[in-house]
A protein has these predicted regions:
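Extended accessory and catalytic-adjacent subdomains in large enzymes
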Residues: 1-156, 163
Length: 164
């Protein structure tokens, strides 16, 4: 599924949302009355707009993965395991900072696992090359196009899946 949101204010709000049902995001006044907006309302709105069961967390996951990918693409290819680990932390930190999360939370819950695995296995470097030569479209940036291609090849391995 894919949807496009071009409203910058909505994108900013979605990126600030937490997956805590009913978490109050902000209040506003209209005609002298106070109205509250909570995360459930934002998630309902996203569902209504898209027609799919998306939530703010889906957008945060997409954003974190995109930031992680783009951050790593700017770095030179690592020559050692130590450099690879340092680069991974850099990419995770960039995504965590953008989302306002810790490194551990971002890695565990927001960055798509295939990105980290692919970087560790040096597979991601071929996608960095595609990213540099892929043209943007009206619907997707070049990094988003490449990420979708990578995700299409992703398979969940039940033997290594983490329990909830």
């Amino acid at each position: 599924h894919s949807i496009t949101i071009r409203n910058k204010r909505l994108i900013k709000l979605v990126n600030q949302c937490e997956e805590i049902p009913g978490w109050e995001l902000f209040n506003y006044f209209e005609k002298g009355e106070k109205h509250r907006i909570d995360s459930s309302m934002v998630n309902d709105y996203i569902h209504q707009l898209s027609g799919y069961n998306f939530s703010a967390k889906d957008f945060r996951t997409w954003a974190a993965s995109k930031i992680f990918f783009e951050s790593l693409s700017e770095l030179p290819a690592p020559k050692t395991t130590k450099e690879k680990d340092k680069n991974l932390l850099y990419g995770i930190d960039q995504a965590a900072q953008a989302l306002g999360n810790t490194r551990n939370v971002c890695r565990a819950y927001y960055i798509h696992p295939t990105l980290i695995e692919s970087y560790e296995d040096t597979i991601l470097s071929q996608y960095f090359e595609k990213y540099k030569t892929t043209e943007e479209s009206t619907d997707f940036t070049s990094s988003e196009k490449v990420l979708l291609e990578l995700y299409a090849k992703y398979e969940i391995r039940l033997d290594s899946a983490k329990p909830f």
